[in-house]
Amino acid sequence: VWGDVPLFIEPTEKYSEAIYKERTDKNYIIDNVILPDLKKAESLINRNKNYERKRISICGVWAIMADVYMWTEQYNLADQTIDKMADIKSSKGRLVDFEPSIQTWHTMFTEELNNKPSDDTPENDEYSTKEFIFLIHFNMDEVGTNGYSYMYQWFSGSGNRAAVLSDKLMSVFNEPDMQGDLRKAYTVKDYQNGNELRKYMAGDISNSLNKTCEVAYPIYRYTDMLLLQAEARARLGKWEEALDLVKKVRDRAGLVTPTALSFASEDEVINYILRERQVELVGEGRRWFDLLRTGKWKEVMKPINGMSQDGNELF
């Protein structure tokens, strides 16, 4: 988001000139602060108690760690870290897993994320779907009238249409190999000549404009990890293994996946995986950071909004 930033590793209890620091190189922060923090968390977290998805579990630690490894181009480590998740068990079996049903994929956003109570029992997992790894919990006592039940009116609850899907995304849905994508009907709502994000909507836009509900927001889920792992394996030259992971996701969406022979270069495979992430994870805050991480933000954004100068990508 910011690139190089000032580094503080001790609390600041009062004002002094010492709070003004020069920026520290982002790679130093990743290597010497973020990754050591994650490895410490990995060693300390209770793997037999922390199952709740609105708190960090060991799989949540690994999800962040794998994400960091992808940013630092340590693809073997990202691949190995994601593999670890399959071994974590709770009383209900695997803690995280792939959800093969498109109907359940839909209801996990519209029902599973809605109206979960706050509690202090990390060993109690309220979620029936294992897709979610970590999410931000919403409590009605804390947020009040948020209008969050429909993402397009999130900011005011009065129909500001804050999450309108772009024409670029809609053109992806219209590509030949995306015809019949079962996710489209659950992702897009044509409303007042615009394409609204309906991923988190259980009903229709017009029947409850100011409805407020307690909806958690997914930060990491297992399909996100599988597609990251596909990208890592593609970077390692394992194209078939990468596409096998993509196939699981596209099978659920009712789509066909090509074989490795259909691609002429690693970059083609990577772009194919990134497009799948764009569609699968729409509304989950992933696309922009995928473009930054892979260095593709200029080629993608310049035709859309003219972004092309180094520094434009940072706040």
Segments from the language model and where they lie:
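Short, cationic low-complexity segments
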Residues: 154-183
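Acidic/polar-rich alpha-helix caps and helix-coil junctions
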Residues: 1-146, 176-315
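Active-site-adjacent substrate-recognition loops and nearby beta-strands
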Residues: 146-155
